[in-house]
Design a protein with these regions (language model features):
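Charged, flexible boundary elements
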Residues: 1-26, 204
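Intrinsically disordered, low-complexity regions enriched in Ser/Pro/Gly/Gln/His and often acidic
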Residues: 15, 41, 65-67, 162, ...
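Eukaryotic intrinsically disordered and solvent-exposed regulatory patches
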Residues: 17-22, 28-30, 73-77, 120-122
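Aspartyl protease active-site motif detector
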Residues: 20-67, 102-104, 108-116
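Structural motif
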Residues: 41, 69-71, 131-133
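C-terminal reverse transcriptase regions that engage the nucleic-acid substrate
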Residues: 66-84
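Aspartic protease core domain of the pepsin/retropepsin superfamily
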Residues: 82-204
Length: 204
């Protein structure tokens, strides 16, 4: 049987009242991931991926695509299947380490990159609404919170100069890493602060 990744609704989670959901156009969110703590698996729409891929191309980077059978459900709607999963190179402002790929299931919908709770936890995400900052402890990065259409979002395309020629990508191109790749996160050695990741499988 298939596993469905379901977004928060009052029908599924038993909330007393329906919360407001913003309709977000993906075309102006290229380069950003939206923080979605109710999402169990990261996903994006085809339009967002095409827009983001053009940003990557300007930096000499590209998306890696693999087959996928992930299924998602938005509210009480019918499940939507993802035929592919994209692995996208990312870099945040102030990030000193290199070699991170975020895995995102690609859906035939017009949604931005919705970063799952699983991904955020593994990055050591700490959202501070009081100081309006977001910290990714496992990357050693603290950033101002960005709001896009009512959502919290993070710029993941702050690429440093000549990143495309960094040796980390050679490591991440090794065939043995892609037999059963982690669905949310792939990384090169040294990509995280030493001793900060406890739940990630080795990717030697």
């Amino acid at each position: 049987s298939s596993t469905y990744f379901t977004f928060t609704t009052n029908q599924i989670f038993g909330a007393d009242a329906t919360s407001t959901t913003w309709i977000t156009e993906s075309i102006d969110l290229g380069g950003y991931m939206v923080l979605d703590t109710a999402c169990q698996r990261s996903c994006c729409g085809e339009v967002w991926l095409k827009t983001h891929a053009k940003i990557l191309e300007r930096h000499g980077l590209r998306v890696k695509m693999i087959e996928s059978s992930d299924q998602f459900q938005f509210g009480s709607g019918k499940p939507i299947a993802a035929a592919e999963r994209a692995y996208i190179p990312i870099e945040m402002e102030g990030q000193e380490t290199k070699g991170l790929l975020f895995g995102v299931s690609v859906l035939s919908t017009n949604i931005p990159f919705l970063a799952s709770r699983t991904l955020l936890e593994r990055l050591g995400c700490i959202i501070d609404m009081f100081t309006k900052t977001i910290t990714f402890a496992n990357l050693g990065v603290t950033l101002p919170l960005t709001h896009k259409h009512g959502h919290l979002a993070v710029n993941i395309a702050m690429f440093s100069e000549d990143l495309a020629n960094h040796p980390c990508w050679k490591h991440l191109s090794r065939d043995q890493l892609w037999h059963e790749p982690d669905p949310e996160l792939m990384f090169a050695p040294g990509a995280f602060n030493k001793g900060s990741i406890r739940d990630l499988p080795p990717q030697a």
